[in-house]
């Protein structure tokens, strides 16, 4: 597999998906987030490698111009399974968490960041590739838990079944993207050094799983999960498959007068900071 990597060797690096920019946010906010994330990476001393597929070419370290081109021209939303297809067909494609972890590991990136991961959708057999990729690839993934639109109980059980290790960063509860609380307890850690110790143990055991580091949305931007659930009940689903998540997130932005968008941007910024700190200290260890 040929990946055009623009990563400077020897420096800490964090991999980031393109789906969050192309399918998860309005264009203006997506570009602002990209610029802010790059600014954070410069301030904190790490490289941010935004990973995507441009006309069949896999790129690790996309530029703002390339990201804008992807938004303008359109891009498929792909998990690990679809990568060879879009590459062979020369298409544009935005990577999900699963594809980003898979491609990151192929070029030596150990730390990946996102907003929220996929999981099990309610009411039907719809399980995200994010879960299966995390169950077979060793990496550190910083997120704010699973997306609030998912079946929380089923996803939590699937994470256990797939033996995916997870820890709460300064929290005792599994966060749900816009919401800090779920009622499900997780092992709590207080600092990045604890992340590194756990990850080192995983390496020693040759445990090929992704360590989920759960970083809750900042308290001032939180939207309680019961409020999100009430709103979701009012939405009539008009799409299926990979279009479900972007559709629901867009509807929630409209129904909350932009509160979910502000929460999304805030948690993504904090997750980039934490992932960068982990990558920097991992490189030194």
From Swiss-Prot:
Catalytic activity: D-ribose 5-phosphate + uracil = psi-UMP + H2O
Cofactor: binding comment: Binds 1 Mn(2+) ion per subunit.
EC number, UniProt record: 4.2.1.70
Temperature section of the record: No activity can be observed at or below 50 degrees Celsius.
Binding-site list for substrate: 77, 97, 128-130
Cofactor(s) named in the record: Mn(2+)
List of catalytic residues: 17, 147
GO molecular function, one term: pseudouridylate synthase activity
Keyword flag Glycosyltransferase: no
Residues that bind Mn(2+): 126
Keyword Metal-binding on entry: yes
Keyword terms of this UniProt record: Glycosidase, Hydrolase, Lyase, Manganese, Metal-binding
Gene Ontology annotations for the cellular component aspect, listed alphabetically: cytoplasm
GO annotation, biological process: nucleobase catabolic process
Role played: Catalyzes the reversible cleavage of pseudouridine 5'-phosphate (PsiMP) to ribose 5-phosphate and uracil. Functions biologically in the cleavage direction, as part of a pseudouridine degradation pathway.
Family assignment from sequence similarity: Belongs to the pseudouridine-5'-phosphate glycosidase family.
Family matches, as PANTHER family: CARBOHYDRATE KINASE PFKB DOMAIN-CONTAINING PROTEIN, ZGC:136858
Summary of subunit composition and partner proteins: Homotrimer.
Name of this chain's protein: Pseudouridine-5'-phosphate glycosidase
Organism of origin: Thermotoga maritima (strain ATCC 43589 / DSM 3109 / JCM 10099 / NBRC 100826 / MSB8)
Gene assigned in the entry: psuG
């Amino acid at each position: 597999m040929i990946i055009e990597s623009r990563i400077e060797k020897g420096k800490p690096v964090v991999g980031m998906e393109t789906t969050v920019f192309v399918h998860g946010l309005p264009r203006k906010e997506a570009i602002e987030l990209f610029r802010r994330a790059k600014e954070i990476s410069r301030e904190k001393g790490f490289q941010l490698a935004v990973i995507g597929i441009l006309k069949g070419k896999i790129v690790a370290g996309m530029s703002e111009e390339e990201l804008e081109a992807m938004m303008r021209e359109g891009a498929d939303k792909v998990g690990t399974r679809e990568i060879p297809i879009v590459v062979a067909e020369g298409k544009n494609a935005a990577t999900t968490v699963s594809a980003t972890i898979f491609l990151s590991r192929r070029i030596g990136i150990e730390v990946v960041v996102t907003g929220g991961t996929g999981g099990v959708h309610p009411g039907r057999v719809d399980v995200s590739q994010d879960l299966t990729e995390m169950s077979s690839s060793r990496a550190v993934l910083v997120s704010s838990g699973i997306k609030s639109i998912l079946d929380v109980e089923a996803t939590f059980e699937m994470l256990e079944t797939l033996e995916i290790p997870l820890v709460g960063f300064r929290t005792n509860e599994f966060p749900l993207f816009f919401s800090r609380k779920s009622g499900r307890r997780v092992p709590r850690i207080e600092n990045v050094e604890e992340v590194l110790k756990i990850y080192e143990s995983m390496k020693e055991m040759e445990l090929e799983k992704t360590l989920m580091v759960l970083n809750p949305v900042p308290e001032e931007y939180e939207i309680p999960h019961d409020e999100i659930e009430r709103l979701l009940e009012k939405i009539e689903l008009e799409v299926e498959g990979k279009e479900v998540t972007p559709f629901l997130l867009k509807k929630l932005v409209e129904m909350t007068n932009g509160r979910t968008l502000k929460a999304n941007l805030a948690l993504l910024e904090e997750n980039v900071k934490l992932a960068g700190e982990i990558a920097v200290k991992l490189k030194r260890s």
